[in-house]
Amino acid sequence: MRLTWLAALAGIWTVSYLCIRQYGKGLPGSLARSVRRAHRPIIALSLLACSGFAYAAQPLVDRSNPDQTVMDFYQVPYAENVVCTSRSAQVFPDTTAGTVSGTAAYRFRNTSGQAWTAAFGVNPGYTISNVRVNGAEVPFSVSDYQEYNEAMLEVALPSDREIELTMDYGGFPRENRNVSIMQGGTEISSEYLCLENAGLSPRLINVLPGENGYPTTIEITLPASMSVIPFGASKAEVVAEQTDGTKTWRYDSNSAGGILYAGDYIRQDIQAGGMDIEFYYGRKHQAVMEAAGAAEAVKSVVDYCTAHYGMLSFGTGDTLKLIQSRVTGGGYAANGASLLDEADFTADNLSDTGKGGGAGEVMIHELVHQWWGLGNMFDASDESSLWSAEGLTVYTTYRIVKERYGPSYAQEHYVDQWQQAVDNYYLNFYVRNPDYLEALPEEERLEISNSLRYVRQYCEMPLKILKAEQLVGGEEAMDRILRGLFNRELDPMYPYLTYQDFLNACGLTEEDLNLA
């Protein structure tokens, strides 16, 4: 993408140079005079053509269907009377070139007595080769059609009862073009690595698991400075050390896909909330994390939130991995593991007084999002709404700080600051005169709107929750209400916690929580 823009801007600049006014002539005359020297227009056209070619063939982005409501790969019927009994992969990332190579093996039991076709999702940047069944080469094809960052690999398999399918794969993993403007998920470097599903090894699409699921063994070879963290309950162990300064890690899992993180991580083991927590963060953040009291913040949050709201649904009950990653958007969670956005733990974010009175309290705020935002999700489609994960997160942070430092500290650094910000909000010229806001240029309007929305979500909503606490009978009553909301039965079609859910649980109306 950088090459695309560099060539485009250089081409445009060259064209503008050709149009510099000469001999009192206008733009067309000056251009006609400049192009007499053939190399000038050739350079301009070459740069523009190079930009167009780079845009069309950029190696980092795939050609996934832009209509993300289409899920054709999930409509592929399962092979009849065929199960996968196990699978494995040996993965060799090149952290210098940013590429991946590997060998994958799949073992099937076919009781149909019929030949059949196995389907896999593969990263569009990978090339498939050396596909063999029980040692013999077999035909295969990779679709031109792509969706959700996958192309479909189809392999013709015989009617044999026991089948071992092996294949080699490798290349530069491409990003989904539908999210290419966001921070990349797939990354391969000596500092950080993330391989998800088809980026790790071809993902099996149309074969059901055997009686033991999809027993999986993954081996990955990386520089010795990197630690491997499977996303989930699996534990990775070093099984070999090579003379070239690399280590081979191995772990077992049970799924058709899988996600793996690796990097120059520091691990801290913390006991909190009845769980053993493995807290992983990048070595480059060590000074910031230690200054913010990260380990103490994790313990405080997990102890408090587990006692008041309940266990996280994505923990195993005994262990939980908290992994700092470069994922954007707040992270995600699965059985036994959860992500923390790297951007939440920068020095700039940890000094944001809107989230807490100091770096340690901002750390608490970000960790509380494991309960409000990840453990319970919020619909963020209405940007004008003051109801979001931030309201309950800021309120919970206030309660934890109040418990740790006392009511006076919490009142001064939280409630009083919320009230001051809300008072200023309703005195704001653009709040009192929204027509003037709409008349501003878009860039200025968005900047002001974002600032105003911040006040409503981070200050006004916590004040409303605090008022609700007083109306329902105090902190213990509010804790019971929030615990019930956190552990409620979710609607799979709309799993979000809404403002109306909160009001109903409190037995209140919107008018009851007006601050005026």
Region spans (language model):
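A surface-exposed beta-strand-loop module
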Residues: 115, 125-185, 241-248
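Juxtacatalytic substrate-recognition/specificity segment
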Residues: 148, 218, 271-381, 385, ...
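Zn2+-dependent metallopeptidase catalytic core
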Residues: 104, 109-111, 118, 156, ...
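N-terminal, polar/Ser/Thr-rich
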Residues: 28-101
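Hydrophobic alpha-helical segments
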Residues: 1-21
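Acidic/His/Gly-enriched intrinsically disordered linker/tail segments
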Residues: 390-463, 471, 492
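Extended, low-hydrophobicity, Ser/Thr/Pro/Gly-biased non-transmembrane segments
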Residues: 59-63, 168-264
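Amphipathic alpha-helical substructures
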Residues: 287, 408, 454-516
